[in-house]
């Protein structure tokens, strides 16, 4: 999985 998730959780 990519840390830059979409949408970003942060």
Curated annotation (Swiss-Prot):
GO cellular component: extracellular region
Organism whose genome encodes this protein: Arabidopsis thaliana
Predominant location category: secreted
Stated name of the protein: 48 kDa cell wall protein
Subcellular locations according to the entry: Secreted, Cell wall
Annotated keywords: Cell wall, Secreted
């Amino acid at each position: 999985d990519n840390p830059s998730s979409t949408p970003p959780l942060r």
